Swiss-Prot record:
<dbReference type="GO" id="GO:0045927">
    <property type="term" value="P:positive regulation of growth"/>
</dbReference>
<dbReference type="GO" id="GO:0046872">
    <property type="term" value="F:metal ion binding"/>
</dbReference>
<dbReference type="InterPro" id="IPR018116">
    <property type="entry name" value="Somatotropin_CS"/>
</dbReference>
<dbReference type="GO" id="GO:0031667">
    <property type="term" value="P:response to nutrient levels"/>
</dbReference>
<keyword id="KW-0732">Signal</keyword>
<dbReference type="GO" id="GO:0046427">
    <property type="term" value="P:positive regulation of receptor signaling pathway via JAK-STAT"/>
</dbReference>
<keyword id="KW-1015">Disulfide bond</keyword>
<feature type="binding site">
    <location>
        <position position="38"/>
    </location>
    <ligand>
        <name>Zn(2+)</name>
    </ligand>
</feature>
<keyword id="KW-0964">Secreted</keyword>
<keyword id="KW-0479">Metal-binding</keyword>
<keyword id="KW-0862">Zinc</keyword>
<comment type="similarity">
    <text>Belongs to the somatotropin/prolactin family.</text>
</comment>
<comment type="function">
    <text>Growth hormone plays an important role in growth control.</text>
</comment>
<dbReference type="Pfam" id="PF00103">
    <property type="entry name" value="Hormone_1"/>
</dbReference>
<feature type="binding site">
    <location>
        <position position="192"/>
    </location>
    <ligand>
        <name>Zn(2+)</name>
    </ligand>
</feature>
<dbReference type="GO" id="GO:0005131">
    <property type="term" value="F:growth hormone receptor binding"/>
</dbReference>
<dbReference type="GO" id="GO:0060396">
    <property type="term" value="P:growth hormone receptor signaling pathway"/>
</dbReference>
Length: 210
């Protein structure tokens, strides 16, 4: 009888620990989604404010740039459409999100110059800090998915895209700024999508359609 009570106690403790871990992971996922959603909204606001300050002819010329031919993150392997995204594992989506966020740590420092004339966008200098916080959160989620297993992802050992990509393209300052903002918005939209689907992957019964 005593042995049965001990076993029951062990099972109950294990269930409570697992429940607590699942609850903490859900909290981390929710925070990550909220953070990247804020960054995506901020990116959209930044580029809208930038475009509002352009002359009609400047706006017409820059409209030819998008859809973008090249972004700093284009060398990072990622799902190319909704179907591929939905078929990707939670771990894969987290790893790609981590790489995308990491690729913006240096370029984000130049965003303040791109929107220096905007008074409604907030403080762009805080973006680098927000990206760093999000990167840490995603890293914790990746470790949780690995559950003590070694990280065997080959992409983690690859060098990041060129840090000064947006500063060495030989374009005018106007085009550089527009490309920087457009690529930032594009990548934050990607990460938001990947994190939402990854979060949905945690529930096998969920419909993770985009």
């Amino acid at each position: 009888m005593a042995r049965a009570l001990v076993l029951l106690s062990v099972v109950l403790v294990s269930l409570l620990v697992n429940q607590g871990t699942a609850s903490e992971n859900q909290r981390l996922f929710n925070n990550a989604v909220i953070r990247v959603q804020h960054l995506h909204q901020l990116a959209a606001k930044m580029i809208n404010d930038f475009e509002d300050n352009l002359l009609p002819e400047e706006r017409r010329q820059l409209s030819k740039i998008f859809p973008l031919s090249f972004c700093n993150s284009d060398s990072i392997e990622a799902p190319t459409g909704k179907d591929e995204t939905q078929k990707s594992s939670m771990l894969k989506l987290l790893r790609i999100s981590f790489r995308l966020i990491e690729s913006w740590e240096f370029p984000s420092q130049t965003l303040s110059g791109a929107v220096s004339n905007s008074l409604t966008v907030g403080n762009p200098n805080q973006i680098t800090e927000k990206l760093a916080d999000l990167k840490v959160g995603i890293s914790v989620l990746i470790k949780g998915c690995l559950d003590g297993q070694p990280n065997m992802d080959d992409n983690d050992s690859l060098p990041l895209p060129f840090e000064d990509f947006y500063l060495t393209m030989g374009e005018s300052s106007l085009r550089e700024s527009f490309r920087l903002l457009a690529c930032f918005k594009k990548d934050m939209h990607k990460v938001e999508t990947y994190l939402r689907v990854a979060n949905c992957r945690r529930s096998l019964d969920s419909n993770c359609t985009l």
